[in-house]
Amino acid sequence: MSQSTSVLRRNGFTFKQFFVAHDRCAMKVGTDGILLGAWAPVAGVKRCLDIGAGSGLLALMLAQRTDDSVMIDAVELESEAAAQAQENINQSPWAERINVHTADIQQWITQQTVRFDLIISNPPYYQQGVECSTPQREQARYTTTLDHPSLLTCAAECITEEGFFCVVLPEQIGNGFTELALSMGWHLRLRTDVAENEARLPHRVLLAFSPQAGECFSDRLVIRGPDQNYSEAYTALTQAFYLFM
């Protein structure tokens, strides 16, 4: 292994089929993104969109889970993060299927003629408050550059009638996001409440919305069992990705 590769692998996360460097990204690879990338429904999709791609994690997870014919667009506003996402994708088995765009999603959407079967986002959710150490981290954490109404509007403009728009959010913020989405004409179709263990209340929620009305399926996912090892359900969801699972 070359010295440059060794340094790269100390600044990222190694999965079974790909590596994500994230040292130049404001937000690092974490459980939220891994949950969303493993959970989002991919059956029958032909084209996917990752809004706020960051390191490219979600785009890479979707590429692993979908057929070779599926194309994925990853849009990231911050130039350093977009450049690192492109590098991660270039080193993956799916470089020809993922297109990275350094752009403001609100402007990028207006130039598109295609529609997406699956749109995915791990969006900012903090309101403006304590300053972050860098403008890049503030952009990744706060809803100042893309608030939730704007995000929902962008997704609505480019989703297919039967498509899904999937997000992961803290539980309480997710409830507010759901109310907002419903008021804008979206329909909640899938909801998974995520708790660290059986004794704790859910701290994250995975949500899938669609323009098309239909039954909403809800469940609960516990990350760790009584022995503090990963639960069977969490293992089943993520074992295709985690290196030592």
UniProtKB/Swiss-Prot annotation:
The enzyme's E.C. designation: 2.1.1.223
Transmembrane segments: none
Coiled coil start-end: none
Organism of derivation: Escherichia coli (strain K12)
Tagged with keyword Cytoplasm: yes
One GO process term, biological-process aspect: tRNA methylation
Alphabetized InterPro entries for the sequence: DNA_methylase_N6_adenine_CS, SAM-dependent_MTases_sf, Small_mtfrase_dom, tRNA_Adenine-N(6)_MTase, tRNA_adenine-N6_MeTrfase
SUPFAM superfamilies for this protein: S-adenosyl-L-methionine-dependent methyltransferases
Top-rank taxon, per record: Bacteria
Keywords recorded for this protein, A-Z: Cytoplasm, Methyltransferase, S-adenosyl-L-methionine, Transferase, tRNA processing
Keyword field contains Kinase: no
Protein name listed in UniProt: tRNA1(Val) (adenine(37)-N6)-methyltransferase
Its biological purpose: Specifically methylates the adenine in position 37 of tRNA(1)(Val) (anticodon cmo5UAC).
HAMAP family linked to this entry: tRNA_methyltr_YfiC
Pfam families: MTS
Top-rank EC class of the record's enzyme: transferase
Compartment(s) of residence: Cytoplasm
UniProt similarity note: Belongs to the methyltransferase superfamily. tRNA (adenine-N(6)-)-methyltransferase family.
